UniProtKB/Swiss-Prot annotation:
This is Electron transfer flavoprotein subunit alpha, mitochondrial. It comes from Macaca fascicularis. GO terms for molecular function: electron transfer activity; flavin adenine dinucleotide binding. Residues 1-19 form a transit peptide. Signal peptide: none annotated. It comes from the Eukaryota.
Length: 333
C-alpha cells in the first residue's frame, strides 16, 4: 500500500536538505592534495547541500586552485599563515571553529588518516559534540555506518548533535573527479595563532615505490619472514610489480620494519587491486585493514592459517622459495 507524504513533511524534508552544508578539511602537502581528501569530498556530497573545502597552510595556492576544479565543491576557503605550516591540530582547530561559526556548517569532516584522527576529536571537543570515526557509508545526513569488532560487525550510528563531526574511511568511497568543478575561492576567517605547540621539522622516507594507502598493488610481510633483512625479498618482488610494501603488526612489533608500514586495524587501511600477503597468518586485526582488497593472494606454509579464509588465491609453500621464483619470472617478462 502506497501512502503519500503529507505536504508538511515534504516541506520539512526539502528544508532540511536545503540547509545542509558540509565543511571538508583538506589534507595536503602545500603543493599536492592527499588522495584521501578526494574520497572525503565524495562522502560529503552524499549528505546533500553545499560542500565547501578549507585549505590551511603556507603557499598552498596550487592546492586551492586544484580543489576549485574538483567536482561537487561549491566553495574553497583558503587560510595561509606560518602557524599552519605543520597542520597542527592546536592551530587548525580555532580556524575551523571560526569558519563553522561564520557559515554555520551542519557537518565537518576529514579523511580518517593520521591527520584527520588527530584533528577532528579536538574540533568535536571544542564544539562539545561527539565525533563519529572512520565511517564507511552514509544513510542520511544524521545516520552513518562504521565497522566495529575489527571489521566483523557494522554499527549504524544516528547522530543528533547540532554539528556532525566525522572522519571518512577513504577506501569506502570513490575519489571525486578532479575536473569539471567550478568552485569559487575566498579567504577564510583569520584567527590568532594559539602557540601551544611549535612545528619544527618533518623528515620523510624517500621511496620510488607508491604510497601504501594509494597503491594499486601491495605486498605485505609478516612474522614468517623471520627478520628485517628478509624483507628484501618483498622489496624485490614489489619493484617488479610497481607495488607498495606493507607489514603485519607482528612484523612491526618484532622490529623488522618501521610502524608506518603497518597494515591493519591500528595501522593503515588499504584496498588495492591486488594484495599479496606473505608469511602473514591473518590475525583479525590485520584482516580489518586489507579485507576490502579486490584480489587477495596469500603465501603461507601453514594450510590452516586464517589468511586463507579471505584469500582469493592461496599458495601453501615456503615463502623463501616461492617469492624469489615469482620475482625471477616477473623479471623475464
Amino acid at each position: 500500500m502506497f501512502r503519500a507524504a503529507a505536504p508538511g513533511q515534504l516541506r520539512r524534508a526539502a528544508s532540511s536538505l536545503r540547509f545542509q552544508s558540509t565543511l571538508v578539511i583538506a589534507e595536503h602537502a602545500n603543493d599536492s592534495l592527499a588522495p584521501i581528501t578526494l574520497n572525503t569530498i565524495t562522502a560529503a556530497t552524499r549528505l546533500g547541500g553545499e560542500v565547501s573545502c578549507l585549505v590551511a597552510g603556507t603557499k598552498c595556492d596550487k592546492v586551492a586552485q586544484d580543489l576549485c576544479k574538483v567536482a561537487g565543491i561549491a566553495k574553497v576557503l583558503v587560510a595561509q599563515h606560518d602557524a599552519y605550516r605543520g597542520l597542527l591540530a592546536e592551530d587548525l582547530t580555532p580556524l575551523i571553529l571560526a569558519t563553522q561559526k561564520q557559515f554555520n556548517y551542519t557537518h565537518i569532516c576529514a579523511g580518517a588518516s593520521a591527520f584527520g584522527k588527530n584533528l577532528l576529536p579536538r574540533v568535536a571537543a571544542k564544539l562539545e559534540v561527539a565525533p563519529i570515526s572512520d565511517i564507511i557509508a552514509i544513510k542520511s545526513p544524521d545516520t552513518f555506518v562504521r565497522t566495529i569488532y575489527a571489521g566483523n560487525a557494522l554499527c549504524t550510528v544516528k547522530c543528533d548533535e547540532k554539528v556532525k563531526v566525522f572522519s571518512v574511511r577513504g577506501t569506502s568511497f570513490e575519489a571525486a573527479a578532479t575536473s569539471g568543478g567550478t568552485a569559487s575561492s575566498e579567504k577564510a576567517s583569520s584567527t590568532s595563532p594559539v602557540e601551544i605547540s611549535e612545528w619544527l621539522d618533518q623528515k620523510l622516507t624517500k621511496s620510488d615505490r607508491p604510497e601504501l594507502t594509494g597503491a594499486k598493488v601491495v605486498v605485505s610481510g609478516g612474522r614468517g619472514l623471520k627478520s628485517g633483512e628478509n624483507f628484501k625479498l618483498l622489496y624485490d618482488l614489489a619493484d617488479q610489480l610497481h607495488a607498495a610494501v606493507g607489514a603485519s603488526r607482528a612484523a612491526v612489533d618484532a622490529g623488522f620494519v618501521p610502524n608506518d608500514m603497518q597494515v591493519g586495524q591500528t595501522g593503515k587501511i588499504v584496498a588495492p587491486e591486488l594484495y599479496i600477503a606473505v608469511g602473514i597468518s591473518g590475525a583479525i586485526q590485520h584482516l580489518a585493514g586489507m579485507k576490502d582488497s579486490k584480489t587477495i593472494v596469500a603465501i603461507n606454509k601453514d594450510p590452516e592459517a586464517p589468511i586463507f579464509q579471505v584469500a582469493d588465491y592461496g599458495i601453501v609453500a615456503d615463502l623463501f622459495k616461492v617469492v624469489p621464483e615469482m620475482t625471477e619470472i616477473l623479471k623475464k617478462k
